[in-house]
Amino acid sequence: MKTGFIGLGSMGLPMAQRLQAQGHDLTLYARRPESLEPFAGTSVAIAATPAEMGALVDAVGICVFDAAGVEEVMFGPDGLAGTLNPGAVVLVHSTVAPAQIRKIAGRAATHGLRVLDAPVSGGQPRALTGELTIMIGGDADTLADVTELLSALSNHVVHLGAVGAGSYAKLVNNTMFSAQIALADDAMKAGESLGVDPAGLAAVLATSSSACVASGVRLRAHSLAGLADSPANLTLTKDVTLMAEILGDAPGSGLVEVAQRFVAAMRSS
């Protein structure tokens, strides 16, 4: 399957590198030429525009920041939709609101294109080793057509339902991740109030029953302020804000309230 990939940021780059390392027939597009430098001297083809890519591939992964970016590469001037062959599969790895991905999928369908929302989790190291979790929303037959492609990136592909279901799951995951960072910060503050040695408490929390990936992020940073420069903060802030808008005061909204403490700390840093 000839594959395209757009979006070579912190997650998109290692995903594209994994596809290339696994021998996929790969075409890339990036707005910034420097993003393509890791592929210099390889067999990877470079497209000048998304439209040029669309004429060359059977499936394309999109890993840009938000829904506006997805719409731009799909339907903007020189977009994919005008040149992809009917039946081509578009995998949207970006985390967007479920209503937005359903709108994008509906518009793509008028061009004969099939869309799966396919947000990912696992971080850069797992992207490079093909061990991401990929959350799928969309048609089961469409998923079957790209199973081999996804297996290069993931050892845990979860089909959650119709288009939008994958995005719901990713928003829940990222909101929980943010909340866990905030709770780890609360735990360290509680220890400080009780006079517990901070380094010792951090060592306990990192190796005991409360340990998790998110708490480890906070403990290694020594404070929430120490996370302010992380590029992940923009994504987490976006996703927690989306989750708050979607969930409102429905059951589970307490999770959002805790996560918003992390968001508020990042905005004030």
Located regions from the model:
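NAD(P)+-binding Rossmann beta1-loop-alpha1 motif at the extreme N-terminus of oxidoreductases
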Residues: 1-62, 193
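Rossmann-fold dinucleotide-binding core
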Residues: 3, 73, 95-172
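Hydrophobic beta-strand scaffold residues
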Residues: 26, 46, 114-116, 157, ...
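Residues in the short beta-alpha loop(s) of Rossmann-like NAD(P)-binding domains
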Residues: 32, 66, 139
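Rossmann-fold NAD(P) dinucleotide-binding segment
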Residues: 50-113
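Helical "substrate-binding/catalytic lid" subdomain
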Residues: 165-251, 255-269
